[in-house]
From Swiss-Prot:
Coiled coil: none annotated. This is Double-strand break repair protein MRE11. There is a cross-link at K282 (Glycyl lysine isopeptide (Lys-Gly) (interchain with G-Cter in UFM1)). The modification N-acetylserine is found at S2. It comes from Mus musculus.
Length: 706
């Protein structure tokens, strides 16, 4: 449909829908560095050409939680280029915006700000890549919101319960209730749904007249018993769900026969993992809503780098390959070379009809060498395609297929972790590795004081959010709590009794999940507070504080038996940090990257002794060591096991969750009209004008509910 289609009247919402844009992905790569920015430019251009009312993003606008200056600058540049202008906005917000955007310093929609000239508003929830972190719980979307380019909604301020208040929009006679829920850890949100702690508030008046649109960013496919959100958990009054986080493009609305709503999964706009789901052609959606009818038009993205993947099982070609043949390796290389050439030919044919597509495609040939075969040197083989593919280092991946045990063949659990190439394990999470390690570890190395879940959360904060104090603060907090427990119980100072009481206390905390959640939150808040204090104290240093000669520092540090050698012409401004010979860290005194995370001042001589003796240390010795040796450096463990996640979307059937009715009301200023709301069900009356409605072919079915 063209922008001047007669169906696009004054009563029809036109919404451009996209998710998982991942700005900044591989931005330092010489070939793929600009892919995300080019595709984001195309998405915004499609919105402008189709004259949409607004853009709806389903999370993960940024790939990194703390995007680089280049990424943030490019994003702001494109939003300013396409979303600002004199074209009037044709819809109005009639809900209480102080509730919808209450966490913002500017709690109103951006196009109603008199200081801004917005022609295409952007509404977005946050994803798991760009979620709020730090002491102030801010994310990159909050920066865009403060700048006036994005309306960040769907943020939950509580970790115990979630009340989802819709943004109520109206265009002509069409009323749209826009619900959003930013990314929450799946296991926590799953538990909230089970405990009926998630409430979707509804308009109190004229419930039947609203089209209910819900945007969510969670696991849709099953990755574990509670590590996903079943569609059956969602309220049945919803008309359409826009599901982010899953990268495979399934943008055509699919009806859930149990809940009777439709689910659209737009998928990502960039290939972030070389897995089969990413090979599906990428689209964004042009969603039209008129009354209670909707239509989703697929808009192909033409600037996405094409990705071709193919699997080869050597054992399936006994006439070509014999593992006992001394020249079988040369035969396998020739076979793989032929397969890759075929994929390159297919990529070239597709590109001939689309000049906007990048020149070098992504190629992945997965070779199953089980059956007695041996892999060859992949790097040497890949040198043949350096100038022809965008991923020359991992064109071929060798793996061995592992049989799944305990399968009946009737029902497949698509969420079980199976063997997968390490580069394809994009859905594997850090806390899963921690939990899996301690579940399979021997008894003598099992945790006896700390909890697996707490350690998993702390490691995730350290790796994903670069909270360098997360692990240390969690250990310190749980140790302090255990010590208080033992003091209150007046336990005899016998090692056996202390060990037994500590184990009992740990088991009781594991059974009480709410208490364990509180522990993790308290430890993480401590870590964020420490980081904020560190950043504040660092920024408070003046030039006078740092401008004294290093010769003075050398004299002051004589007790440490470390000699500081002043460098030529750079003696001033370095004294308090110590000489460069003490550490390889850059200027500034600490490294906060993922591989270091500990400040230089903590790398004392006692840390090595602590880490070397901690392996066989009893609990009572650990208590003593906390007073004698405050430094904690734990040698990292390497996990070489590769995990594979099946991305199939086959759903298990879950019983419908009963929900309590709740009512609410809100008041607004002259700029934001009032609207009271409730959580009762909707009576769907028969539409008498279906024959005349232009959206009949894609309309929602007529439903009768209490």
């Amino acid at each position: 449909m063209s922008p001047t289609d007669p169906l696009d009247d004054e009563d029809t919402f036109k919404i451009l829908v996209a998710t998982d844009i991942h700005l900044g992905f591989m931005e330092k790569d010489a070939v793929r560095g600009n892919d995300t920015f080019v595709t984001f430019d195309e998405i915004l251009r499609l919105a402008l050409e189709n004259e949409v009312d607004f853009i709806l993003l389903g999370g993960d606008l940024f790939h990194e939680n703390k995007p680089s200056r280049k990424t943030l600058h490019s994003c702001l540049e494109l939003l300013r280029k396409y979303c600002m202008g004199d074209r009037p906005v044709q819809f109005e917000v009639i809900s209480d915006q102080s509730v919808n955007f209450g966490f913002s310093k500017f709690p109103w929609v951006n196009y109603q700000d008199g200081n801004l000239n917005i022609s295409i508003p952007v509404f977005s929830i946050h994803g798991n890549h760009d979620d709020p972190t730090g002491a102030d719980a801010l994310c990159a979307l909050d920066v865009l919101s403060c700048a006036g380019f994005v309306n960040h909604f769907g943020r939950s301020m509580s970790v115990e319960k979630v009340d989802i208040s819709p943004v109520l929009l109206q265009k002509g006679s069409t009323k749209l209730a826009l619900y959003g829920l930013g990314s929450i850890p799946d296991e926590r949100l799953y538990r909230m749904f089970v405990n009926k702690k998630v409430t979707m508030l509804r308009p109190k008046e004229d419930e039947n007249s609203w089209f209910n649109l819900f945007v969510i960013h969670q696991n849709r496919s099953k990755h574990g018993n509670t590590n996903f959100i079943p569609e059956q958990f969602l309220d049945d009054f919803i008309d359409l769900v826009i599901w982010g986080h899953e990268h495979e493009c399934k943008i055509g609305p699919i009806k859930n026969e149990q809940q009777l709503f439709y689910v659209s999964q737009p998928g990502s706009s960039v290939v972030t993992s070389l897995s089969p789901g990413e090979a599906v052609k990428k689209h964004v959606g042009l969603l039209r809503i008129k009354g209670r009818k909707m239509n989703m038009q697929k808009l192909p993205l033409r600037t996405v780098r094409r990705f071709f993947i193919e699997d080869v099982v050597l054992a399936n070609h006994p006439n070509l390959f014999n593992p006992d043949n001394p020249k079988v390796t040369q035969a396998i290389q020739s076979f793989c070379l032929e397969k890759i050439e075929e994929m390159l030919d297919s990529a070239e044919r597709e590109r001939l009809g689309n000049p906007q597509q990048p020149g070098k495609p992504l190629i992945r040939l997965r070779v199953d060498y089980s059956g007695g075969f041996e892999p060859f040197n992949v790097l040497r083989f890949s040198q043949k395609f350096v100038d022809r593919v965008a991923n020359p280092k991992d064109v071929i991946h060798f793996f061995r297929h592992r049989e799944q045990k305990g399968k009946t063949g009737e029902e497949i659990n698509f969420g079980m972790l199976i063997t997968k190439p390490a580069s394809e394990g994009a859905t594997l999470r850090v806390e899963d590795l921690v939990k899996q390690y301690f579940q399979t570890a021997e008894k003598n190395v099992q945790l006896s004081l700390l909890t697996e879940r707490g350690m998993g959360e702390a490691v995730q904060e350290f790796v994903d959010k670069e909270e360098k104090d997360a692990i240390e603060e969690l250990v310190k907090y749980q140790l302090e709590k255990t010590q208080r427990f033992l003091k209150e119980r007046h336990i005899d100072a016998l090692e056996d009794k202390i060990d037994e009481e500590v184990r009992r206390f740990r088991e009781s905390r594991q059974r009480n999940t709410n208490e364990e959640d509180d522990e993790v939150r308290e430890a993480m808040s401590r870590a964020r507070a420490l980081r904020s204090q560190s950043e504040t104290s660092t920024s408070a240093f003046s030039a006078e504080d740092l401008s004294f000669d290093t010769s003075e520092q050398t004299a002051n540090d004589s007790d440490d038996s470390l000699s500081a050698v002043p460098s030529r012409g750079r003696g001033r401004g370095r004294g308090r940090r110590g000489a460069r010979g003490q550490s390889s860290a850059p200027r500034g005194g600490s490294q906060r990257g993922r591989d270091t995370g500990l400040e230089i001042t903590t790398r004392g001589r006692s840390s090595k002794a602590t880490s070397s003796t901690s392996r066989n240390m009893s609990i009572i010795d650990a208590f003593r060591s906390t007073r004698q040796q405050p430094s904690r450096n734990v040698a990292p463990k390497n996990y070489s096991e590769t995990i594979e996640v099946d991305d199939s979307d086959e759903d298990d059937i879950f019983p419908t969750n009963s929900r309590a009715d709740q009512r609410w009301s809100g008041t607004t200023s002259s700029k934001r009209m009032s609207q009271s709301q409730t959580a009762k069900g909707v009576d769907f009356e028969s539409d008498e004008d279906d024959d005349d409605d232009p959206f009949m072919s894609s309309s929602c079915p007529r439903r009768n509910r209490r």
